[in-house]
Amino acid sequence: MSILYEERLDGALPDVDRTSVLMALREHVPGLEILHTDEEIIPYECDGLSAYRTRPLLVVLPKQMEQVTAILAVCHRLRVPVVTRGAGTGLSGGALPLEKGVLLVMARFKEILDINPVGRRARVQPGVRNLAISQAVAPHNLYYAPDPSSQIACSIGGNVAENAGGVHCLKYGLTVHNLLKIEVQTLDGEALTLGSDALDSPGFDLLALFTGSEGMLGVTTEVTVKLLPKPPVARVLLASFDSVEKAGLAVGDIIANGIIPGGLEMMDNLSIRAAEDFIHAGYPVDAEAILLCELDGVESDVQEDCERVNDILLKAGATDVRLAQDEAERVRFWAGRKNAFPAVGRISPDYYCMDGTIPRRALPGVLEGIARLSQQYDLRVANVFHAGDGNMHPLILFDANEPGEFARAEELGGKILELCVEVGGSISGEHGIGREKINQMCAQFNSDEITTFHAVKAAFDPDGLLNPGKNIPTLHRCAEFGAMHVHHGHLPFPELERF
């Protein structure tokens, strides 16, 4: 089944004319930069999930918020779909353009508007890079906690859209847990403030509803984030294991003992070797799996927790446990993990990154299941996990130049996500649904739940013009997805019209 927008399954889009939209934008949005030739728009035909590509009708790059309002007004009046894009680092096709839609690029809004060290908050524009926030507040001994692997490039607006996490989300939470409020523009011109400067606000929690909505409800125009004081001490333990199953069990043992690490990450042998060859982090390349466990806080507590975790790891079957001897080694240990994705990209022509979550207790069994599926589909899988909260990132290695190999990788990825659902988990932890997992949403949710999701979208976007075909499948798509499952991946009587 095609993962790109298919009107038969995802709903008909308005039939728009490029020239008329271009003329309307030029007339009503003075000074707006508009890209419309093939040479100009090719760089925007995908996000970080480069396997799926579509050239948009137009690309617009506003530099003033008034222009954003005017762009949305024009698109609303002409019934033109709008896809919002931040830095384009997303891994689920959430910012994949539409052939009949305008791509609204928010990358030029990169000003840090205000830093309040006493109130421990910062007010920023949506194009500000994640890491730039921590760099800006570092002189105040503060930082912004969510740290996705792409934090050097990804934008805070995109983080809000996907509810991004990172290696330290086990203790410090996802994006939604680190926001105070956001300013939002709806397609029909309404400006909304969701959340407040206080720790809580009355009424429904629309801030939580909007965070992770993948650009389907409105456009984020400003973000107020919470800041945290830097922990006085942070130490990292690196534990080696002779099996991934033992490493998986050790994760549960640490949490069961009442210890909440700042980060608890797991890598298997394939990802270990790739990262070590790329970063030279000091990883044991003969280990079947490693755990990275960071403990932070005051010196006395960290020292005690390090000793406890060391004992837990050894009892769980660790063949070796190393404590980073200084800050430089701690940074190297984390650099290997944070560069695992590009490292794997060096050992395979292509890779397909999954993002499922499972209960910690299910980790050993799911790892065994992934190994079986890897053999069944004859594709290598490098496993990288936010192990502490059960967020898995299996990287499926393939060669797009080999006919049929990407389709096989897609199918394998879908089976892994469905395995996550079977054990009580979810098809996404932090990358979002986008186009990539639109079919697997049908395995995660029933028709009543999906109908409710559509009702929520309609409350914010009654015309369905904001990022259509992402995140929430139509019931038509789910019916066809179910038919394919019943018939082992093939539609019965494919020559017949479906709906």
Swiss-Prot record:
GO molecular function, one term: FAD binding
Catalytic activity annotation: glycolate + A = glyoxylate + AH2; (R)-lactate + A = pyruvate + AH2
GO CC aspect terms: glycolate oxidase complex; plasma membrane
Residue ranges annotated for the FAD-binding PCMH-type domain, each copy included: 52-230
Signal peptide residues on this chain, from the entry's feature table: none
BP terms from Gene Ontology: DNA damage response; glycolate catabolic process
Pfam families hit by this protein: FAD-oxidase_C, FAD_binding_4
Cofactor(s) essential for the protein: FAD
EC number(s) per entry: 1.1.99.14
UniProt note on regulation of activity: In vitro the glycolate oxidase activity is inhibited by the sulfhydryl inhibitors CuSO4 and PCMB, by KCN, but not by the metal complexing agent EDTA.
Disruption phenotype: Abolishes glycolate oxidase activity. Is unable to grow on glycolate as the sole source of carbon, in contrast to wild type.
Entries under InterPro entries matching the protein: FAD-bd_oxidored_4_C, FAD-bd_PCMH, FAD-bd_PCMH-like_sf, FAD-bd_PCMH_sub1, FAD-bd_PCMH_sub2, FAD-linked_Oxase-like_C, FAD-linked_OxidoTrans_Type4, GlcD
Upregulating conditions: Induced in the presence of glycolate or glyoxylate. Part of the glcDEFGB operon, which is induced by growth on glycolate, under the positive control of GlcC. Also induced by growth on acetate. Expression of the glc operon is strongly dependent on the integration host factor (IHF) and is repressed by the global respiratory regulator ArcA-P.
pH effect on activity, per entry: Optimum pH is 8.0-8.8.
Keyword line: Cell inner membrane, Cell membrane, FAD, Flavoprotein, Membrane, Oxidoreductase
Predominant location category: membrane
Compartments, record wording: Cell inner membrane
Assembly: The glycolate oxidase likely consists of three subunits, GlcD, GlcE and GlcF.
Assigned protein family: Belongs to the FAD-binding oxidoreductase/transferase type 4 family.
Role, per record: Component of a complex that catalyzes the oxidation of glycolate to glyoxylate. Is required for E.coli to grow on glycolate as a sole source of carbon. Is also able to oxidize D-lactate ((R)-lactate) with a similar rate. Does not link directly to O(2), and 2,6-dichloroindophenol (DCIP) and phenazine methosulfate (PMS) can act as artificial electron acceptors in vitro, but the physiological molecule that functions as a primary electron acceptor during glycolate oxidation is unknown.
NCBIfam families documented for this protein: glcD (TIGR00387), PRK11230.1 (NF008408)
Protein name: Glycolate oxidase subunit GlcD
Species of origin: Escherichia coli (strain K12)
Gene: glcD
